[in-house]
């Protein structure tokens, strides 16, 4: 069967540079020309994680809808949830262009965007306008590059968006903001989480509603770094981890033409590394803490492997660049078919079934 995206749309989009093509895809979703996906509800895929109901475990990762322009349109493609951002208090342009590069043979992307976004106020207006609509929409928050107090920027994000967020993600793992990953260090992370969770507690008391907070970490951590993060997280009232952000590694690439570009690598080559780190973090934090697995998800099979490695939920972004807007629905259908095939009553039963394999994998 001919895939119309791969046959017609992708060649046209790939005539443009990656950032322009991304803008065109956002514009396409806004026009409502994209047909909505009408997936039948499969209660075996539904879960309650961190107090939130997810109709299926597949989400759109942060980075696609940076300015909260199309969260509902993304849900309409079949995603069980969508995450917008990363949002910083003040608008910022990010790093100089070009700053996104396709590695077509590897179905990968390198980006050094640098938290380019329109700032809190523009996103707040858009999210306020959709506040009465259903669906889980998370808000990924970060710090301005020139912030004197980066922790204060995260606190500002919690306070500003508290009435509108299904959940928050504190993004401290982008490699494209100088010094940001230093917040993953043990003492710095403790200070950050104490401030963020105190702001959450304050806002929850006012609103009468507790919004979950996740922490997004890098795949390039040492074993000691993973130990430190687990220790800090388990000592606090954090709701979960997102594993992982993009990698600085270029291991295993076949498309070397642009592999030397600075920035974070995402897409299929990230799958093994990010899944191994996911399993190692699951082993460290135990069974109770929710984890969202991200990195190289391109099919129902890779989504299932994330779950078997310890993820409650999974996210994707880069692989949709190559597979098109039909990918989320295809994955969700594939998950249902896998449960049919194996006689599984709930996808949650598969979680952790291959943690030992993945955490032992040399990557």
UniProtKB/Swiss-Prot annotation:
Name of the top EC class for this enzyme: oxidoreductase
EC number from the UniProt entry: 1.3.5.2
Metabolic or biological pathway: Pyrimidine metabolism; UMP biosynthesis via de novo pathway; orotate from (S)-dihydroorotate (quinone route): step 1/1
UniProt xrefs under Pfam families: DHO_dh
Membrane topology type: Peripheral membrane protein
Domain of life of the native organism: Bacteria
Catalytic reactions of this protein: (S)-dihydroorotate + a quinone = orotate + a quinol
Acyltransferase found in the keyword field: no
CDD domains in alphabetical order: DHOD_2_like
Name of this protein: Dihydroorotate dehydrogenase (quinone)
Organism: Allorhizobium ampelinum (strain ATCC BAA-846 / DSM 112012 / S4) (Agrobacterium vitis (strain S4))
Lineage start: Bacteria, Pseudomonadati, Pseudomonadota, Alphaproteobacteria, Hyphomicrobiales
Gene name linked to the record: pyrD
């Amino acid at each position: 069967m001919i895939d119309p995206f791969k046959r017609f749309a992708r060649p046209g989009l790939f005539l443009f540079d990656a950032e322009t093509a991304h803008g065109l895809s956002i514009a396409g979703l806004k026009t409502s020309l994209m047909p909505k996906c009408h997936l039948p509800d499969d209660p075996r895929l539904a879960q309650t994680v961190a107090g939130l109901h997810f109709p299926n475990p597949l989400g759109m990762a942060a980075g696609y809808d940076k300015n909260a322009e199309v969260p509902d349109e993304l849900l309409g493609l079949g995603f069980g949830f969508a995450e917008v951002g990363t949002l910083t208090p003040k608008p910022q342009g990010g790093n100089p262009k070009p700053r996104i590069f396709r590695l077509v043979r590897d179905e990968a992307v390198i980006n050094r965007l640098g938290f380019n976004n329109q700032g809190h106020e523009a996103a707040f207006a858009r999210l306020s306008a959709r506040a009465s609509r259903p669906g889980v929409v998370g808000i990924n928050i970060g710090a301005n590059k020139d912030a004197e107090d980066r922790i204060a920027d995260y606190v500002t994000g919690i306070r500003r968006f508290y009435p509108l967020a299904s959940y928050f993600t504190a993004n401290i793992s982008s490699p494209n903001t100088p010094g940001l990953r230093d917040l993953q260090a043990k003492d710095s992370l403790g200070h950050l989480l104490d401030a963020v969770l105190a702001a959450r507690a304050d806002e929850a008391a006012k609103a009468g509603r507790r919004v979950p907070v996740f922490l997004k970490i890098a795949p390039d951590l040492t074993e000691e770094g993973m130990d430190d993060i687990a220790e800090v997280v388990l000592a606090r009232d954090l709701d979960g981890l997102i594993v992982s952000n993009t990698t600085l590694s270029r291991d295993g690439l076949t498309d070397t033409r642009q592999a030397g570009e600075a920035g974070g690598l995402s897409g299929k080559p990230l799958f093994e590394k990010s899944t191994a780190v996911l399993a190692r973090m699951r082993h460290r934090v135990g069974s109770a803490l929710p984890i969202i697995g991200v990195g190289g998800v391109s099919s129902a099979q890779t989504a299932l492997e994330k779950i078997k490695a310890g993820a409650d939920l999974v996210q994707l972004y880069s692989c949709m660049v190559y597979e098109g807007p039909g990918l989320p629905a295809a994955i969700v259908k594939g998950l249902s078919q896998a449960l049919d095939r194996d006689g599984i009553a709930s996808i949650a039963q598969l979680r952790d079934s291959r943690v030992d394999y993945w955490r032992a994998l040399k990557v």
